[in-house]
Amino acid sequence: MKYPKSGNYRSAIVMKDLDFDGTDEAIAFYRTASENKAEVHMLVMYCANGGWKLSENCTIDATDVDCVDFADVTGNGTLEILSGYTTYNSSVNNLACHSYSGGKTTGLTVESSYSSFYCADFDGNGINEVMLLSLYNTENDATANMLVYSEERNCLYSKSTVKMDPNITRFKNLSVTATENSQNALIVDGCFANDDTVTQIIYFNNELSVLRNPLFKEKDKNITQRSADVLCADINNDSVIEIPVVNQLPSASDEDKSNVAYKTSWNTFYQQSEILNHISDQIIDYDNGYSFTVPEGWIDGTYTVRFDKEKQAMCFFEWYDGTLGEKLFEIRAFKLEQWDIGEDSDAYTLIYKSDSTAYAFADVNEDNNLSVSEDDIKTAFSLLTVNNI
């Protein structure tokens, strides 16, 4: 049996109702030990008269299965099987597409390789397209390539291609979000060889009938490039993906920068003008699993934050005329047993207590232009979850 190496379906046998008749079909991948050449078999099976029937045994020239996904790319109301297969080049895979209906499986012609792919309705016509993403190598440029279905030719062909950052060495996360006109855009988090993360946004411009990648400029640094390992996410549960822009807060030139916190500015993508629209700012403590949302009244350059790693604390300060000003407050993470016995915690007010950690604040400065109330501190505190980091 062969197990897909990536994607949402990792089983060698995948169950999926391809024709929406209420009964799952089965898709199985295998390679026999006796085969001398590199071939992977994909079996498509359906249930009839109380037993399983073979619809098709598809043979693909490959050694392994990269991934499998399902989408209605033909617009006929059934799900096509999109399966990817590895090649001798670890960053290049080959795509195959098969359509199932009434017990019969037929192949669609696809002549495109990829590094990662994603299926969604990118042009708003109600039918899924296939977005192929390719990393740069000696054989291919770094591109995004949108495939659409041609009924006349029974194939998936390239409708539009756009350049991507050739310095990306791998893709970390792909997600789709709706823009202000409800059209889907593909959010692509990738990383460089030095492990910096960068975001690119791929969308189809219906007026020009072209793919666009507005955050990538060949001669300019992408504003989303960041050393912090933070990915695009829906931070406020509004079903829209936010894009982070990360910058270190102010510090003195001779200061230890490892203790200086970063500000993460969260933005949505505004398609009409191809800009990032600012939503909110956060200071994130990854080690202790929480974030603090910066008050709207705080202006950039007037505040800064330091990590006290010995105390497991995040300390907020005024930043005035290039120097560290008054302390505003601090948030500290206590081990639960430490908090429960009152060890070094008398001056602290509890924000939240989990199974292992108590989060609390202290040293609230009430006489500063940047002062915030205790209730505001509690409201701005948030635990990190899968959806909001």
Model-derived regions, located:
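A short acidic-to-branched-hydrophobic micro-motif
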Residues: 318-338
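Secondary-structure transition/turn motif
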Residues: 191, 317-323, 363-368
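Beta-propeller-forming repeat regions
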Residues: 1-307, 313-315, 339-360, 379-389
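Domain-scale activation on soluble regions of proteins
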Residues: 355-371
